[in-house]
Amino acid sequence: MASSYAHAMERQALLPARLDGPAGLDNLQAKKNFSVSHLLDLEEAGDMVAAQGDEGGGEPGRSLLESPGLTSGSDTPQQDNDQLNSEEKKKRKQRRNRTTFNSSQLQALERVFERTHYPDAFVREDLARRVNLTEARVQVWFQNRRAKFRRNERAMLASKNASLLKSYSGDVTAVEQPIVPRPAPRPTDYLSWGTASPYSAMATYSTTCTNASPAQGMNMANSIANLRLKAKEYSLQRNQVPTVN
């Protein structure tokens, strides 16, 4: 105990001597300066971190929601719908914006359309300056005018084809009327002959020719009657000629 107490007293006696010396003061001041500057640096860094924590970490997740790139799921469909509605409104406004042409403008446009249906850019620009319109309006007018011209041409061709078909069908029905032939009269002498006559085959053939004209039927009947008369005369002459033994 006595030795330890004596050692402590010696250290206390030596401490003032170290502090009073110039080297000891310089070392202590250097340590003090270094530690203060280091603490200031740490305090400044800590203040910056604390400020960032107060700004960003006060409400967790708020910065993510408030960032422009990230939005909540409930807001996204509503924004898309608003954007679509605005685009539809713009389209409707563009469609409703139509140009009304006066009589002088229409006359000038029609006069150029009679010359050419497809004017080039130089012609359109010159015409637009003359009628006090934009080149885009003139181009749209020519597009609509060409479409109207094509519709009128198709309507005219359809009406012409319908009239031609109607006239052709009338001519065909007038030509293709059926003609009913008259039945040929039967001769009276044909009924007087029997079936055993040698010319009965010719008589049966005459009955099949019912579709012939009346004049042809009469000529055929006369020729058959003449043949029958000749046959009778021949048979009578044969019976009268005596036979030679």
Swiss-Prot record:
GO biological process entries: artery morphogenesis; cartilage development; embryonic cranial skeleton morphogenesis; embryonic limb morphogenesis; inner ear morphogenesis; mesenchymal cell proliferation; middle ear morphogenesis; neuron fate determination
Biased composition annotated in UniProt, kind: Polar residues: 69-84
Keyword DNA-binding attributed: yes
Location within or outside the cell: Nucleus
GO cellular component: cytosol; nucleoplasm; nucleus
Region feature (Disordered): 50-103
Entry keyword Nucleus: yes
Name listed for the protein in its UniProt record: Paired mesoderm homeobox protein 1
